[in-house]
């Protein structure tokens, strides 16, 4: 990546990945998760603290060309906030609903654990998520293009 240009991956169709979130794995590797127009979230890995990166590939997580965010929690697990919806690859965008939270131990296998918003009115977008000192997750996102919504997530209460 140079001068903020999109990362070009390899595959049957070019992977144009933007807006990365960085995860730090227990073994020291870094992983980025990125939004795409390829109907899935893109990923790339680094074993040298970001000096070099693997080829960008598509994950199994759906993406409708809408923003995502991810965070590595203090216990080493990873959290992803995203719209759990795929568009046809190459289409501009899909409905920005539902807005979901997924968890992963390895950054590869993601399990949806919570739906924050799910309405045909749509437009739950540009999420951001962090883990607070209290261990809870704190998320903000655009709500129906009308306001910013805040949500606190206590993972101990999710089965």
Q: Which residues are covered by each model-predicted region?
A:
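Asp-box/BNR beta-propeller blade signature and adjacent active/binding-site loops
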Residues: 1-159
